[in-house]
């Protein structure tokens, strides 16, 4: 008997959805940064084992939108809860249910498929706090399963996989067994660069940055030559991203190259520039060019 199903992971921004997906896949597939809203696009990730295939839709965190990109991210996350076989609602024990959580719960109540409550970061919280959070959420909604985990340390991830297998239906293998992600290489490269920029810039530049891959060519020796722009919204942000004598941009390129080489399994040369695009997050045509395809 072979089983297959589509699974979506929802939760407030910065709750650890991408980290959980990475723990399940044991691969660095989804951009992980300590800052909220770093996952901007639905990424279908495929886990294939001998007797089942799980297709994960990694979504942006649900939050109140402030611009066109924000509207897209919220719609993307909400749409992902439709036409799936299982929903994982990820929370942190050290945070009481806020308006965002209550908003998600109201949507989950309309879902016709099993919903798991997954408590992340249990290794960072006392058992009393975890128990208190469980009780609070259990009173708000009935869940098919409640699983405490540590995505970062991999605790109870195998248990979570077993329970997901239990609830998904019998079905075909939708993707080849060696396929682990349905986004193209250019998209992944852009996400890796953006992650490094977010990490290195810390609080110096807000979320108003994107990465535009201008060229990605592979020569006869298998070496990739990549060129791209880091887009920012203000002229004042440009020197911050570049850094003194180009030091910050050089570090972004260096750290990105290491991960890109691991991803592509090839040697990589990468050149990056910084370009100002004012209010790019409200520019629908540019958002489509950057890969946010469902903009209207």
From Swiss-Prot:
Residues 58-61 are annotated as: G3. NCBIfam families: era, PRK00089.1, small_GTP. Keywords: Cell membrane, Cytoplasm, GTP-binding, Membrane, Nucleotide-binding, Ribosome biogenesis, RNA-binding, rRNA-binding. It is found in: Cytoplasm; Cell membrane. Residues 11-18 are annotated as: G1. Residues 37-41 are annotated as: G2. Its main location: cytoplasm. It is a peripheral membrane protein. The lineage of its organism: Bacteria, Bacillati, Bacillota, Clostridia, Eubacteriales. GTP binds at residues 11-18, 58-62, 120-123. This is GTPase Era. Residues 201-278 form the KH type-2 domain. It comes from Clostridium botulinum (strain Loch Maree / Type A3). Residues 3-170 form the Era-type G domain. Monomer. It comes from the Bacteria. InterPro entries: G_ERA_dom (IPR030388), GTP-bd (IPR006073), GTPase_Era-like (IPR005662), KH_dom-like_a/b (IPR015946), KH_dom_type_2 (IPR004044), KH_sf_prok-type (IPR009019), P-loop_NTPase (IPR027417), Small_GTP-bd (IPR005225). Belongs to the TRAFAC class TrmE-Era-EngA-EngB-Septin-like GTPase superfamily. Era GTPase family.
